[in-house]
């Protein structure tokens, strides 16, 4: 049985993990009888957004606690991940990836990724273990791995940010994936595009299948 780590960033696309992207990822992994462990940072979100009005709320919310809503409580803090214990890593998107797992949403090409997440991503990369990234999450890979290699990923139709981060960006529709065989990366744009839910699901399904295929070639 394969073991896959999934990192999420809260609950809700405006300030946390994109719920559809996360659920589609978990569903497709379950279809392949994969042992999944879900992780999230144990710290407060950058901010909290009312998903009905899309306005900021005057409250604080812990990322791990919020993420537990999607994980049905079966979740661990980010510092529990050890790359050696898993066959692959997958990162769904949402604004949480741009604000809680990085500061891309604030600094664009000048963004950084927290040291703990950097070490996790580099750990999987150094062990040649495949990494899947969805929506805005491929930009995290570009930030973290730019001092190690030049990667190929996608954010969908517009990849200017990826190019500014020193990576190669490929145009891709929601139902397809971009594969970087050399660096063992698989990406799909999902909600970076205004596409039907069925197409987004198809793209994530393809990503999961390709990541699992890569696991057998480690």
For the regions a protein language model found, what residue spans apply to each?
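Active-site-adjacent pocket-lining segments in enzyme domains
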Residues: 5-31, 35-37, 74-76, 80-218
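A short, charged/proline- and glycine-enriched loop
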Residues: 1-2
């Amino acid at each position: 049985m394969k073991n896959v780590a999934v990192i999420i960033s809260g609950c809700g696309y405006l300030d946390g993990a994109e719920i559809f992207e996360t659920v589609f990822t978990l569903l497709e992994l379950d279809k392949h009888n994969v042992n999944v462990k879900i992780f999230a940072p144990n710290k407060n979100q950058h901010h909290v957004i009312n998903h009905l009005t899309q306005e900021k709320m005057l409250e604080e919310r812990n990322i791990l606690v919020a993420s537990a809503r999607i994980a049905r409580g079966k979740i661990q803090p980010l510092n529990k991940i050890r790359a050696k214990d898993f066959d692959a890593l997958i990162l769904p998107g949402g604004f949480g990836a741009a604000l809680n797992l990085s500061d891309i949403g604030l600094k664009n090409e000048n963004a950084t990724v927290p040291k703990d997440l950097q070490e996790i991503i580099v750990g999987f990369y150094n062990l040649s273990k495949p990494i899947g990234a969805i929506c805005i999450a491929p930009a995290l890979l570009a930030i973290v791995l730019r001092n190690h290699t030049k990667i190929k990923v996608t954010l969908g139709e517009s990849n200017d940010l990826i190019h500014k981060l020193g990576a190669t960006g490929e145009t891709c529709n929601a139902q397809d994936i971009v594969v970087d065989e050399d660096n063992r990366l698989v990406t799909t744009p999902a909600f970076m595009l205004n596409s039907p839910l069925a197409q987004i699901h198809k793209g994530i399904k393809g990503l999961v299948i390709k990541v699992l295929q890569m696991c057998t070639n480690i």
